A protein has these predicted regions:
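Conserved alpha-helical scaffold segments that buttress catalytic/binding sites
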Residues: 2-269
Length: 269
């Protein structure tokens, strides 16, 4: 779909924190230039401040505030000790948020369009949610841009850190926060063998959903098995790195999705 200004909102200037003299913060270095025509950065941030998909999945609303909450903390931080930030303060940009409406399918198309624009302007995109249903349109954006830029098939890999598998069936043919990876597999956006469900928990998913994934070759890293392996010397960060390296070797581009449910004390958020 054509992406016009009415579907995008710039970052709230109040979130762009400014430090004292000699104490520069990320809020002073990020570029918020729009449109992204002619922009080339290493990292571009986009937001999807929408939790309609969480509501449709019978979850608690509130994730719509995620992009602003994350930016509020991020832009107070000091820049990394990286020469790139000293030489080029425009090393990363923030393209703002897609503007959600009442139709979740339209919202997803808007998010995909904004993400595609960001991917064309940068080497990597950090997409802030919002409900986890936005993993699907962001993955579609990655596949489309990857195929176009590299004149390739657009083979993507996804490593998702989440206790939930998120392979529920749609209800009333609508996507929601429990459907993203089933939608991506059913829609042939991703080869199921290129999907790693890292940290899935048996007490957070139906047995039928585990079976559905295994029948299709999805790689499941069960949390309890990761913990057992850690006790014999296989650290969880090392297991994560190995899976990521495998996906990089098999794919044109890779997406990492982190759901807050994976954080201690936040299950159900």
């Amino acid at each position: 779909m054509d992406f016009t200004e009415e579907f995008r909102k710039s970052v709230d200037p109040e979130l762009l924190f400014k430090g004292r003299p000699g104490d520069v913060r990320l809020g002073e270095l990020v570029s918020t230039k729009w449109p992204l025509v002619g922009v080339t950065t290493r990292i571009c941030i986009v937001g999807a401040p929408d939790d309609l998909g969480v509501h449709l999945n019978r979850g608690r609303r509130g994730a719509a505030g995620g992009p602003s909450a994350i930016r509020r903390e991020l832009y107070r931080m000091t820049p990394p000790m990286d020469k790139a930030f000293e030489v080029d303060p425009g090393v990363f940009c923030d393209a703002g948020d897609m503007v959600p409406g009442s139709d979740i399918t339209v919202n997803h198309r808007r998010a995909q369009s904004l993400c595609e624009l960001a991917l064309n302007a940068s080497r990597a995109v950090v997409a802030l949610g919002g409900g986890n249903d936005y993993s699907a349109p962001h993955a579609r954006a990655l596949r489309e841009v990857s195929a176009a830029q590299k004149d390739a098939t657009g083979t993507i890999g996804i490593l998702t850190v989440d206790p939930h598998l998120d392979v529920r069936e749609r209800e009333s043919n609508l996507p929601h926060s429990g459907t993203p990876y089933r939608d991506l597999i059913d829609g042939a956006t991703i080869d199921p063998r290129n999907l790693v469900e890292f940290g899935a928990r048996k007490n957070r998913n139906a047995a039928a959903h585990f079976a559905w994934c295994r029948e299709r070759g999805v790689v499941i890293r069960d949390f309890s098995e990761l913990r057992r392996a850690e006790r014999i010397g296989v650290r969880i960060p090392d297991a994560f790195a190995q899976d990521l390296e495998r996906l990089v070797a098999r794919s044109d581009d890779v997406m990492v999705s982190i759901d807050l449910d994976a954080c201690a004390g936040l299950t159900g958020v």
